[in-house]
Amino acid sequence: MRRGRLLIAGLAALVLSACATLPEPVDDPKARYQEAVERLRAQTDWDASGRAALRTADDAGSLSLEWRQRGETYQVDLRAPLGAGSARLEGGPEGVWLTTSAGDREYAPDPETLVAWFTGYQVPVSALRYWLRGLDAPGPEVERLDLDPAGRPERLHQAGWEVVYRDWSQTNGLPLPRRLDISRGEDSVRVVIRDWSLAP
């Protein structure tokens, strides 16, 4: 009987010792989010292609987009359906140019002005570069950020806009949005990304 008690006590001590040395499982959505943010911000070269649906109180439209980001410079190709026209947006620290398929070429210090001129819609292009990847944009304060259990953004409020992430994909081991809704008042943009490509 005494030997049995000693054996049980020894096993219990062994189990407790093993439990004490095992690392705590990391299942913190905020930690996962911060890890993804660091990796995504370090990824300065990327491509994304998909579609955008634009809506106001009394109008709606859609276009396809091809976004090519290389450091601080970018090229975005916009195409309206049924041959209604296309444009290329080229931007960087010096400003932004927009060239249309009709041969028009316009310059502005920010992309929002040019996209509004071409499409007639308000689109937060400068912030979209970050929101597309599930990141907050530098500058304006983040008013709200909700994460899902996997540490991915569900809802982001920034610069007066609300970004709701509806679906996600995985590219090079990184979570990247597949579908997101962006809205401010009666203006809204739904973006669906078909393909992501990250530089190795």
UniProtKB/Swiss-Prot annotation:
Database matches in CDD domains: LolB
Entry's localization field: Cell outer membrane
Principal location: membrane
Gene3D superfamilies, A to Z: Lipoprotein localisation LolA/LolB/LppX
Membrane topology: Lipid-anchor
Lipid attachment residues per UniProt (S-diacylglycerol cysteine): 19
Glycoprotein in keyword set: no
Database matches in PROSITE patterns: PROKAR_LIPOPROTEIN (PS51257)
One term under GO cellular component: cell outer membrane
Covalently lipidated residues, kind N-palmitoyl cysteine: 19
Signal peptide limits: 1-18
Subunit comment: Monomer.
Function: Plays a critical role in the incorporation of lipoproteins in the outer membrane after they are released by the LolA protein.
HAMAP family with a match to the protein in the record: LolB
Family membership noted in the UniProt record: Belongs to the LolB family.
Name assigned to this protein: Outer-membrane lipoprotein LolB
